Structure formats: structure tokens, C-alpha cells
Amino acid sequence: MTYVDTSVLAAYYCPEPLSNKAQQALQREDLLAISWLVETEFLSMLARKVRTREIRAAEGLRVLAVFQAHLEQGIYQRLALEREHFAKAREWLATFTVPLQTLDALHLAVAAMQGCPILTADAALAKACARIGITAHLIS
């Protein structure tokens, strides 16, 4: 199972420079996982693209419908955030040495505690993964 970061989903569902690479990377994986946090971040990203007129509202609704259909089809296994994920994120952040934002620390905690590598288009996140011993596959 591979944990898919929001940055990859953004490139997969919306036209971006990394869209082709995101598609190829997702097709190579057998079992894809996201957390409820990824789903929320994806919707936030989509809303931002509509608000900033990067895409039209109709396109945003189309993308959302496709993503929702994929969720309903079980393309992604949804992972819940649990108390232990917050504790693990807190542990990493308390070292003061791992350059993670709050939500990224939570993503990595979910992936780490599931024993999943993470697929990301975020170079800083991939670098943080290396610091804490999580396998990251960076698309760039």
C-alpha cells in the first residue's frame, strides 16, 4: 500500500506540469491509500483553484465528481486519523529538527504507522521523510 499525498492528487486530477508523471506513478501502484486529511486538503486545493480562477467552477465540479466517483469505487483506501497519529506527529515536531508543518507531520504519521511509503510531488516533504526514516517516492 502506498500513501498518496495531496500534491500528487492535485497533479492527477487537475492540469499541472506534473500531471503525466502523477498519472504514471499512480498507475504503477497496486494499492493506494489516502487519509481523510488528504481528502479535505484536496477539496481545499480545488476550491482555491476555483477562487483564484485557475479553473472555472464547472471544471472544479467536474474534478470533484471524478474524485468522488474514485472514492466510491474504492480506488483509494481511506485511513482515519487516530490519537496515535497525533502523538507520533507531536514526537517528531518536538525534536525541533524535522522541518515539518503540522498537517504534513500528520500525513507522515499515518503513512509511517501503516508501514506505507509515501508518493509525493513535494520535495520538502520527501526530504523530511528521509530524516525520519519513511520511504518517499518523489515525482518531479
Regions found by a protein language model. Give the residues of each.
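Short, well-structured N-terminal submotif of metal-dependent ribonuclease cores
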Residues: 1-38, 45, 49-64
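Short active-site oxyanion
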Residues: 29-32, 77, 112-118
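Aromatic- and histidine-enriched alpha-helix N-cap/loop-to-helix transition segments
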Residues: 37-40, 84, 103-106
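Short amphipathic alpha-helical interaction patches enriched in hydrophobic/aromatic residues
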Residues: 46, 50-53, 71, 75, ...
